[in-house]
Amino acid sequence: SRFVDIIAERFDAGVRLGPEVGSGMIAVRISPDMEMAVVGTPEHFRRYGFPQTPADLVAHPCIAYQFGDGSLYAWELNVDGKKITHPPQGQWAFADSYMEAKAARLGLGLAYVPEELITDDLAQGTLIRVLQRYSQRLEGSFLYYPHRNVSPALRAVIDTLRM
């Protein structure tokens, strides 16, 4: 994902994962960190088997997250304390994690989504989580804005969303 120059593009503020922002910007946390989960349907695992390691994901159709610039999010996983990436291979890409989870429910492949989106599915058995010990915890969302000239309206938004 790219950093949006909110000043040049005339935005009052932006939202992104993690607190890394450009110089002259302030970042305010607005959501908790996210535990990511690799999930699929029972039928998917009957057909393809259960992956035991991240390397096994190449044998599975995977649902991708697509950024606004068209690039795909490479799944970030932990192996022996090191971050590795898995570029998802499959026919489906969505610019929305909710749609990724829905596609997984429909049996279109494995999805790598925030656990909070699929908690009910896991409890009901409609989705099964795999590779849990390899999953990453991603930093939550931050609202970022220029240090100068905070309008009363933006201040109200910041104060409401701040965690």
Where are these regions (language model features)?
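Beta->alpha turn/N-cap motifs
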Residues: 1, 16-19, 40-42, 113-116
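Short beta-strand-to-loop elements that line the ligand-binding cleft
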Residues: 64, 85-96
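A late-sequence structural motif
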Residues: 131-163
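Central regulatory/effector-binding core of bacterial HTH transcription factors
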Residues: 1-23
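Ligand-binding cleft/hinge of the Venus flytrap
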Residues: 73-87, 121
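Short beta-strand->loop
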Residues: 28-31, 124-136
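Flexible hinge/capping segments at coil-to-helix
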Residues: 24-35, 40-65, 80
